[in-house]
Amino acid sequence: MNLSNQPLVSVVIPCYNHEKFVQDCIQSVIDQTYQNIELIIIDDGSKDGSVEKIQEMIPACQERFIRFEFRYRPNKGLSETLNEALEWCEGLYLSPIASDDQMLKQKIQI
C-alpha cells in the first residue's frame, strides 16, 4: 500500500521505570500492520534500566518508522510528559500507549 494514501499516526510512549516491559511495548508498535506511523518515546526520568532498554531498540525503530524520536528528561509526571510529546507529534491521529502495555498487531489498522 502506498503510504501517501494512509494518514500519519503518531504513537506516543511515555515511560517511567518500566525496564521489564518497555521493549515488549515498543516491539508491539513495530509489529503493527499499519505502516505510516511515527513513534515518540519520552522517558520521564526513570531510575531503573528503562533508558538502556529503549536505546537497544533504537536501530529497529529508525528502520521501521517514518519518524522516530526518543527523549530523556528529568521526571515531571505523566501529564506534562504527554503534553510535551504532543508538541512533537506530526500525525493526523494520536495513539498513546503506556510503556507497560502492548498493542495487538492490527490496533492502528482498525
Question: What do the predicted segments below correspond to?
Answer:
Residues 1-110:
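Nucleotide-sugar donor-binding/catalytic module of glycosyltransferases
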